Amino acid sequence: MNYLTMISLALLVMTGVESGVRDAYIADNKNCIFTCYRDSYCKTECIKNGAETGYCIWIGEYGNACWCIKLPNKVPIKVPGKCNGR
């Protein structure tokens, strides 16, 4: 049993699992994306919300939208479905 625990722990360390963060399209509390035209805007918004960095994805799945790297789980992200505010 100890071997199984040690192997599992080693795999987690080797794969670099970071709990509490993810890469995603940042959204407001109404599931609306942050529309962008410049990387600097997204970088500012992402960092302000606790991400490592961010950039603008042009003509992506949701149009021109901000993509954040290592965004905390507490920050809303775009989920499938409509924007409820526009």
From Swiss-Prot:
Gene3D superfamilies in UniProt: Knottin, scorpion toxin-like
Coiled-coil residues: none
GO cellular component terms, semicolon-separated: extracellular region
Subcellular localization(s) per the UniProt record: Secreted
Broad class of where this protein is predominantly found: secreted
Pfam families, alphabetized: Toxin_3 (PF00537)
Molecular function via GO: sodium channel inhibitor activity; toxin activity
Tissues where this protein is expressed: Expressed by the venom gland.
Family: Belongs to the long (4 C-C) scorpion toxin superfamily. Sodium channel inhibitor family. Alpha subfamily.
Domain characteristics, as noted in the entry: Has the structural arrangement of an alpha-helix connected to antiparallel beta-sheets by disulfide bonds (CS-alpha/beta).
Function: Binds voltage-dependently at site-3 of sodium channels (Nav) and inhibits the inactivation of the activated channels, thereby blocking neuronal transmission.
Name of the molecule in the record: Neurotoxin 8-related gene product 1/2/3
Organism (species): Androctonus mauritanicus mauritanicus (Scorpion)
